[in-house]
Amino acid sequence: MPIRILPSDLSSQISAGEIIERPASVVKEIIENSIDAGSKNINIIVENSGFQSIILKDDGCGIDKKDLLLAVCHHATSKINSLSDLDKLTTFGFRGEALASIRAVSRLTLISCTRFNDVAAKIYLEGFCSKNIILQPIAHPEGTTIIVDNLFYNIPVRLKFLKNKKLEFSKICEVVKKIALSHFYINFSLKHNNKLITQYNSINNRKNKINRLKDIFDTLDTSEFLEIKEKKYRMVLFGWISHPYNFKKIKNIQYCYVNNRYLYNNIFVNAVRAAYSKIEQKKNISFVLYLTIESFNIDINIHPTKNEIKFHNPDVVYTFIYEAVFSYLKKIKEKYYFNFSCKKQTQLNKEKEFYFYDSDPTFLTLISSIFLKKKQICKNIKNKIKHNNFISKSTPLEKYESSIGRLLIIIHKYYGLIYHDNNFLLLSFPVAKGIVRKQKLKNNIQKENIIEYFLSNIKINLTSQEYLILFNKKEILSKFGFHLIFKKKYVILSSIPAFLKKCNFHIIISNFFAFLFLKKQVFISDIVDWFYINVFIELKNWTYIRGIEVLLEIEYYCPLLLINPPSKLLQKININAALCILKI
């Protein structure tokens, strides 16, 4: 549809377009225009947080040269002809004010070419004071380039309120992130001051859409999210929700989209929270959800930024979202019920189903509360340093040398370079920490000093053989903090060792019990070794301070280990061999 100026009676009924408040407003408007043009590649280049320059290049259908001058006028659009067209709108823009608003506060250059044009056309405008605007021919591939220079050059008062350039650039990044989250098939790139900041590659396979979340939230553990898809009431809900029984701290992420348009809607958020409250009381609920609904069932013409919409049937939408999320949470709940059946040895490493029962069978609850048994509190490393005087107060931390040696630097996140007696050694921190925790567990068992975490009673369905195995091992399990109550046909688990509280312990316990079912006879050392392999060795980014702490702990808990350290813990670096190679 060609660009045309809307008649005054129609333009007066459309809500006012967004005022350009900051550089992020410009980026949002021009990206949405590119998406409406069918672009597959959108590149944004920003200088000085957008105040000096914002450049967007796309490979969309372009603007015909005869429409280029109209494109920068108020109420000029190709999206609608009448008010009724809003009911079947599928594009972002429709008011025809984006480029006009940007033009009013900047020096704007617009270059575009369609597949029907032999040559591209270019126009340059400075605010609304530009006169005798001339179309200039220029070489340009199919698509559009928009250059916004000197934003707010003619409104210096606005610049006084936008002094924090880091904040303004972060808002630009957030705009790109929100749009990229709902347009998987588009390549997005963002450069700032000639430096590539983000690059989101297109994803055309639905199964790989979760990769866009990984790209955008680089520290996010996507394994803690569940994919959902539900279709009902002529609506489709798709996306990801955080695992209801995940005990790791994850970033609080809440993104709602309706017909691929980002918005924050109370109906959305309240429906999701209500669904979670029926399963598990969680303060931090994360989700990225996409609702597809027929255009005539929503009104997008109620807010200048289009970040709010009106549902014509809000109760139906709320019910649909609530039922969709709750049904998936309920399935996950049932999946993690305890159901131990160990008939084959090959099932040892398979996840077992967990069955959790409340006193009311109609409302099953997974661990509704976990609290620490106020029995004993282990001393942390700071107390060890304080009371055992491992380090003199006058000794600088970077010069502290343990019996292993002096820690120089951290290498590849997990290893420490240590200098000792003119030798360089490489220490594995994950292995070292695992050994320390293993030794501490042995010490606590010997002293009957295991700290327990109490759970709301968890009912475990067992076969007669499994029941007998656990019954014969109940004493050794109690030493580790597993308190089991044996009923006629099932077992109730009421506590676990405290060191499991930060793990996904429902999976750990499943695998641990499966390990027990395959062992005719189990000793304390066997269980300690199992936890060492499956729980204690953790790959985390190590810092210099944490490295010093683990050296102190090895000295304190495992002094004999230093006489003949295992090869997986400590490796000597052959400096002499390297020097021989380097000699001229």
Curated annotation (Swiss-Prot):
Show the InterPro entries listed in the entry.
DNA_mismatch_repair_CS, DNA_mismatch_repair_MutL, DNA_mismatch_S5_2-like, HATPase_C_sf, MutL/Mlh/PMS, MutL/Mlh/Pms-like, MutL_C, MutL_C_dimsub
CDD domains xref list: HATPase_MutL-MLH-PMS-like, MutL_Trans_MutL
Q: Which GO terms describe its biological process?
A: mismatch repair
| Record bears the keyword DNA damage | yes
* Gene Ontology molecular functions: ATP binding; ATP hydrolysis activity; ATP-dependent DNA damage sensor activity; mismatched DNA binding
A GO CC term assigned to this protein in UniProt: mismatch repair complex
Annotated keywords: DNA damage, DNA repair
What exactly does this protein do?
This protein is involved in the repair of mismatches in DNA. It is required for dam-dependent methyl-directed DNA mismatch repair. May act as a 'molecular matchmaker', a protein that promotes the formation of a stable complex between two or more DNA-binding proteins in an ATP-dependent manner without itself being part of a final effector complex.
Entry's family note? Belongs to the DNA mismatch repair MutL/HexB family.
Write down the PANTHER family for this protein, in alphabetical order: DNA MISMATCH REPAIR PROTEIN MLH, PMS, MUTL, DNA MISMATCH REPAIR PROTEIN MLH1
Q: Which NCBIfam families match?
A: mutl (TIGR00585)
**The name this protein goes by in its record:** DNA mismatch repair protein MutL
